[in-house]
Regions:
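PAPS-dependent sulfotransferase catalytic core
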Residues: 1-30, 164-167
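Short amphipathic alpha-helical segments that mediate assembly, nucleic-acid/protein binding
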Residues: 23-27, 111, 197, 215
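PAPS-dependent sulfotransferase catalytic domain
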Residues: 37-156, 170, 177-179
């Protein structure tokens, strides 16, 4: 959607032919086109950057002005260890950490900045879920999400989870990145972070967990 919006904003014929109003028609049609083959009453759109203010504004202006967002927050050191472990299993070539620590880089730096900026918006339509709560009390967290959206609750069996959609991780270069295990639990990752990496993670933790954020920093890295 973001690329489409940028194209519309920089497409001279829309301006020359007085068709700027067409932009909203194009944008509002995209979700229906993307999910046209899905026959479900509820669709949960997943994306690390949806909580960024420019993306929430884009959605509210074109799709649903009262849209609600669930923001999953996880300690950065856990994210780093998980990614590095996957890189090792996938025979990653090069430094395991360096590119993950570059300003504005995906999937860690830029996402952390987006979560930080999320807190600059009115908060009534955001629900923050800590990953540690999700794995330790999954049913309680799921109830919170159902209540947040006002949906009828479903009886989940968190001890026998079935993966019904498989993402092609070959496009990410990390086979197993989106594999869902049968039970919701913490999986121990045997990765020891170097001191400079641990310090980097702690600094980002401050930005996503603290109420007071460095807005300039977040804007520059999102």
């Amino acid at each position: 959607m973001w690329q489409t919006q940028q194209t519309c904003d920089n497409y001279p014929p829309l301006f020359a032919n007085h068709r700027l109003h067409t932009k909203k028609d194009i944008m509002s049609a995209l979700p229906g086109l993307y999910y046209k083959d899905v026959r479900k009453p509820i669709i949960i759109e997943k994306g690390r950057m949806w909580c960024h203010p420019v993306n929430t504004a884009m959605w509210r202006e074109n799709i649903n002005p009262d849209q609600k967002f669930v923001v999953l927050v996880r300690p950065i050191e856990d994210v780093m260890k998980s990614l590095v472990s996957l890189r090792i299993k996938n025979n990653h070539q090069g430094d395991l950490y360096e590119d993950l620590m570059q300003p504005g880089a995906e999937p860690i730096f830029r996402t952390a900045a987006a979560i930080a900026l999320c807190k600059t918006q009115p908060q009534e339509n955001f629900l923050y879920i800590d990953y540690r709560d999700l794995v330790s009390q999954p049913l309680k967290v799921l109830d919170l999400i159902y209540d947040f959206y006002g949906w009828d609750k479903f009886q989940h069996n968190v001890k026998k989870v079935k993966q019904v959609f498989t993402e092609d991780d070959a496009h990410h270069g990390l086979d197993g990145m989106h594999k869902i295990r049968e039970t919701i639990s913490v999986k121990k990752v045997n990765v020891d972070l170097p001191p400079k990496v641990a310090e980097f993670c702690e600094e980002l933790n401050k930005m996503i967990y603290d109420k007071q954020i460095d807005v300039k920093w977040a804007c520059n890295n999102s």
